[in-house]
């Protein structure tokens, strides 16, 4: 299928590109909003007909006590937030699977599980993770894990367990990265993505805006993502949730239209990736969320919490999707 790109009110058939420059991406980000939305709509309707939104539920399996110093994260042991550290606690397998079953009953398509780790370590906790992945897949759900860095062997074992996707965000641009985290390099993140891909697991990889970065930084982040070949299958776009006790606690909320611009540009750059409207959605309001759906977001996190931050409840999201006129799995599950 050919994707249509609008330029100067004309249509040009294009293929997926993996050679974007930062200047090109910045030009997209800074276009007049109506032009940007129009172009994103053309790409989205052509590449992803039907306007169907994937619902992903997210559970924090192991919360707090992380060795990383991510400036935005209340789970870091370096930050003085009120998230209780649980460095040795793993939620029991049966409890996780009960939550997954409840998410499916509510209409979720994907169940995501998070561990606040710098890296996966072999042992009982990893074996429990594998069992959880297998159990989630047996329920008929896609399974996604986020747990930091991993080895090639661990990636292979996760693939054998049936893991659908592994989440490992880039967070921000290579240029701004050391302002946000110093305990892991950008290259280590890229290498983790390569190991995931080599194991045959799909990539879930995106970033966060609102951390003090510039428009050029946002363009650079999107450029790195769009030049991954093939594109990440899922691209979460997060707005900073400034949590008390973290170094970024005093930053203002993200301008909702900046989230709309990020979603629209991601859609144009990565036509068939699932662009997931992720953290910070509660701060956007109904109208901005609908604009994000119009701009090409075709996945949301579904449920009342995202790891350690709040999220709209199921009833609110069902009303939102109905008002926007988009389709999701919960409609069929209620029939």
Curated annotation (Swiss-Prot):
[2Fe-2S] cluster binds at residues 112, 144, 204, 276. Pfam families: BATS, Radical_SAM. [4Fe-4S] cluster binds at residues 66, 70, 73. Pathway: Cofactor biosynthesis; biotin biosynthesis; biotin from 7,8-diaminononanoate: step 2/2. InterPro entries: Aldolase_TIM, BATS_dom, Biotin_synth/BioAB, Biotin_synthase, Elp3/MiaA/NifB-like_rSAM, rSAM. CDD domains: Radical_SAM. It is an enzyme of class 2 (transferase). Its EC number is 2.8.1.6. It catalyses: (4R,5S)-dethiobiotin + (sulfur carrier)-SH + 2 reduced [2Fe-2S]-[ferredoxin] + 2 S-adenosyl-L-methionine = (sulfur carrier)-H + biotin + 2 5'-deoxyadenosine + 2 L-methionine + 2 oxidized [2Fe-2S]-[ferredoxin]. Keywords: 2Fe-2S, 4Fe-4S, Biotin biosynthesis, Iron, Iron-sulfur, Metal-binding, S-adenosyl-L-methionine, Transferase. GO terms for molecular function: 2 iron, 2 sulfur cluster binding; 4 iron, 4 sulfur cluster binding; biotin synthase activity; iron ion binding. It comes from the Bacteria. One of its GO terms (biological process) is biotin biosynthetic process. Binds 1 [4Fe-4S] cluster. The cluster is coordinated with 3 cysteines and an exchangeable S-adenosyl-L-methionine. Coiled coil: none annotated. Residues 51-281 form the Radical SAM core domain. SUPFAM superfamilies: Radical SAM enzymes. Its cofactor is [4Fe-4S] cluster; [2Fe-2S] cluster. Belongs to the radical SAM superfamily. Biotin synthase family. NCBIfam families: bioB (TIGR00433). Homodimer. HAMAP family: BioB. Catalyzes the conversion of dethiobiotin (DTB) to biotin by the insertion of a sulfur atom into dethiobiotin via a radical-based mechanism. This is Biotin synthase. It comes from Prochlorococcus marinus (strain MIT 9313).
